[in-house]
Amino acid sequence: MIELLSAAETWVAVGFAILMVVFVYFGVHRTVLNALDNRRDRIKAELDEASRLKEEAAKLLADYKARAASAEREAEAIIASAKDEAERIAAEAKAKLEDFVARRTKTAEGKIAMAEAQAIADVRAAAANAAVAAASSILSQSVKGSVADELIGKGIAEVRSKLN
């Protein structure tokens, strides 16, 4: 037994046992257990909060993705609408231009036809005047007197009515 009392391990065991008795007497084990329980509860609360935040972040991400997809669809619809509007405006402008060109062409053709008719009328009038002058000159040289004046008047009137 003396050997047992002189061994350092024995005194370490006795000191440890006394320390444990003191801890039990003062309720240190309850304090340690309460501290561990509090830590467990705090960690559980933090994990619950982290889980809630993760779910909230997932919902926000899903909402963001849905909004982004909706915005993309809306942008595509706006682009398609703008393209359709641009095509409609271009077609309308083309139709107006074609109508304008057709009216201008018709007006120009009408002016050309009027100028042509006027030129033909001027040529006919000049030809009639030349024919009247020639007939008058020929008749006045070949026929003399009152008969000549009467024939010349009838001939001139007839030529004018037929040539104009």
UniProtKB/Swiss-Prot annotation:
Q: How does it sit in the membrane?
A: Single-pass membrane protein
Compartments, as annotated in UniProt: Cell inner membrane
Q: Does the keyword Secreted apply?
A: no
Could you tell me one molecular function GO term of this UniProt entry?
Answer: proton-transporting ATPase activity, rotational mechanism
Give one Pfam hit by family name.
ATP-synt_B
Gene Ontology cellular component terms for the protein in this record: plasma membrane; proton-transporting ATP synthase complex
Q: Membrane spanning segments where? A: 8-28
Q: What keywords tag this UniProt record?
A: ATP synthesis, Cell inner membrane, Cell membrane, CF(0), Hydrogen ion transport, Ion transport, Membrane, Transmembrane, Transmembrane helix, Transport
Family per similarity comment: Belongs to the ATPase B chain family.
Under the subunit heading, UniProt states: F-type ATPases have 2 components, F(1) - the catalytic core - and F(0) - the membrane proton channel. F(1) has five subunits: alpha(3), beta(3), gamma(1), delta(1), epsilon(1). F(0) has three main subunits: a(1), b(2) and c(10-14). The alpha and beta chains form an alternating ring which encloses part of the gamma chain. F(1) is attached to F(0) by a central stalk formed by the gamma and epsilon chains, while a peripheral stalk is formed by the delta and b chains.
The entry's function note states: F(1)F(0) ATP synthase produces ATP from ADP in the presence of a proton or sodium gradient. F-type ATPases consist of two structural domains, F(1) containing the extramembraneous catalytic core and F(0) containing the membrane proton channel, linked together by a central stalk and a peripheral stalk. During catalysis, ATP synthesis in the catalytic domain of F(1) is coupled via a rotary mechanism of the central stalk subunits to proton translocation.
Protein name (database record)? ATP synthase subunit b 1
- Write down the species: Rhodopseudomonas palustris (strain BisA53)
